[in-house]
Every structure is written in structure tokens, then in C-alpha cells.
Amino acid sequence: MKNYIEIVDVYARQILDSRCNPTVEVEVELEDGTVGVAAVPSGASTGAFEAVELRDGDKSKYLGKGVLKAVDNVNTIIADELVGMNVLDQVAIDKTMIELDGTDNKAKLGANAMLGVSLACAKAAANSLGMSLYQYIGGVNGKVLPVPMMNIINGGKHADNNVDLQEFMIMPAGAPSFSEALRMCSEVYHALKSTLKAQGYDTGVGDEGGFAPNLKSNEEAIVVIIEAIKKAGYTPGEDIFIALDPASSEIFEDGKYNLAGEGRVLTPEEMANYYVELAEKYPIISIEDGMAEEDWDGWKILTEKIGNKVQLVGDDLFVTNTERLSKGIKLGVANSILIKLNQIGTLTETLNAIEMAERAGYTAVVSHRSGETEDTTIADLVVAVNAGQIKTGAPARSERVAKYNQLLRIEEELNDMGEYRGLKAFYNINK
């Protein structure tokens, strides 16, 4: 196997994401003519501690959301340093960009510029070696197909409705394989659409392909999903479980949680009890961002109450950042981390966060963003690191389905070597 393959060109362009906003796409060319291409996603509800996504701010073009500055940074500053480097040395590539940027949050070059380059380099390396991306990143050990965490009802910032909690999801942890899990979710999605229609609700979809009806309460979203699970012929809490992403930082005001759609304002203790009641009443296996990103006390309360039986995922809380995660581990808050590549900005730092989480007994959930592209890197990443769970939207909208289809290909390629862990993916809670 080759041990040095030179980078000969690094080039970026501005493309569109699934929300009609510009984003960065990068091509990396190698001495043997191989090319790797990667496109960068973007979030709607972003954590305050995420790495900086560089936008142009020119209101006359794309409402100020252009990324030509980030593109230029790739084509000049970053390209000048990386051309001539060994594409197989991912750590050196990412370290070089981090040093070039010189800030704590990638504000100079932009995390969107750096991530595009980081991922394009990994893809170029894999292509040059004739390997799948998951094999290149994970080696011979990358073999676990993930349980989908599939968003089928949208609220909050992902939809224009009166539902406060941002995402209501299903997890087919009782499925025997990934392909069967995907089939189950697809059938529930269709059952949910017909159930909503029958009850007179709108079946328009949100950013991530989930439906966005004007339901009477957050709890009604859970009830209608359970009805759809049963209608599809499955057993809630056995075949398929419920997962929530309240995105609580978005409803946290003056130390309290404002459930405006329900006309309720709750203290952190009351909010924790709200989740406790839901978890006792319904088969909820995972809650993401149940508390706000700076409400460490609230997180502690929630973890002490249900952290032994519900997966508590830190997204805005941890932002794929080892410093934030280390603090959470020391304080004993949450028991899982959401992994979003663009929150931190390089593949190396992403892998470091996953490794830290797993060493501490935290699960890792690899995730998309609400503004996505046809790029399928996260499908390969989740298998490479054996994370066991992926969050990438409803089985609708091609930028979401692209990830699921890539996982079907990987499952086929792994054949008997592949493993779908189902409930075993939730190894740190009592189910």
C-alpha cells in the first residue's frame, strides 16, 4: 500500500444546500489524478459554542448568506499550505488548517471552509487507495450499521407551526437489520401521513422531511406517532421506540423554559419532571438537548432523574467539542453526545470527540444538519466508528434519503461482517 500520495490541487466553490442557502463544496486532487469531493452542511438551530460558519454578510446577495469568503480562504490560504502534503496524513492536514486559522472557534478561515477540505482529503485518500470511505476511516473494525433516529414530526425552528419541541423521532431498535429498520420507518412514515390526513391535519413537511402539523400540544405529537406505529403493524416500545429533540436552548428565557404553544413556563426542575412524566407514559428511549446549553444545573437534575433509563444526548451542550464534553463528563451530565462534523470543523477533532465519549461510557449519535446536501460522508462515518446510531431526517427529501441509501450499500458490502445492534446500541441505560 502507498504511504505517500501528494495533494496537487485544492479547490472550492459555492453551491446550494437543501434550504436554498449557499454552502461550500471542495475538490481535492491528488498526484495520481484521483479526486475527492465534499460538501458542507449548515444548521438552523445552532449552539452558541459551535465553530464559526463564515458567511459574507452582503445583503444584496443571498440575503447575506453567501460563502465566497470561505471559498476564497480555501482557494488561497489553505490551498497554498496543503498542496504538496501527504493526503494520507489526515492529522497533519487538519492540524495545519487549525494552526493557519489560529482562533479558538475557526473564525478566521471558517469551519465551513476547513471541514470541506478535511472531508475532501479523506475522500480523495480513500478513492486513491480503492477503499470505501468507512473502511479508510475505520479500518477493519468499522462494521456496525446504525439504528436510525428518524425525525417524522417537526416543530420549533424546523417548522412553521405551534409545536414547541423541535423533533419527534422514531428508532426501530427492535429491527433485525438496518435494511429492515429502514423499511419499518418508511412504513410508519406513510402510516403517519394517512393518520394526520384522516384527522384533518396538514401533511406539509419541514426542513428534515418530517411532517409539520399544527397539533394541539407536544404530547399530541407523541400520541399520533404511536398511533402510526400501531397502524403500520408494529409494537411501540418493542419494535419501535420514540426519541425527542426539544432543542431546549431555543425555548430557554430568563432561566425558565417557555412552552409557548401550550401556554406554560417551567423551571428547570419542572421541565425535568415534564420529561419524567413523558418517559413514564410513553416508550421514549432518547431525549436530545432536554435542557439548554448553559443550564448545567438543569442537565444535572435531568440526568439524576432519568439518566439510567433514557439516553440523554448533548448537542448544543457539547457541540462535538472535547472541552465541553470533558466538562460534562466531570459533572456527570447527559450520557450521550451528538456528533455534527461542522460544529467542530475537522475530521480529526470529530474522531477525538467520539473517542472521548466512548471512553467515558457515553454513546455517540452521528448527525446531519437541517441544511444538508447530497454528500453522504456521515453514513460512512457512523459505520467507521461503530457509533451504532445515526440521525439524518425522515425517509423523504433526497438529501436525507441519500444517507440511508449509502448505508444500504454499505450493509450490502459488509454482508455477513456487518452488525446491527438494535437495543444493544443503548448500552449505558436500562431498557
UniProtKB/Swiss-Prot annotation:
Cofactor: binding details: Binds a second Mg(2+) ion via substrate during catalysis.
Gene Ontology MF term list: magnesium ion binding; phosphopyruvate hydratase activity
Keywords tagged on the record: Cytoplasm, Glycolysis, Lyase, Magnesium, Metal-binding, Secreted
Primary localisation category: cytoplasm
Location in or out of the cell: Cytoplasm; Secreted; Cell surface
Any one biological process term the GO annotation gives: glycolytic process
Family: Belongs to the enolase family.
Protein's UniProt name: Enolase
Gene: eno
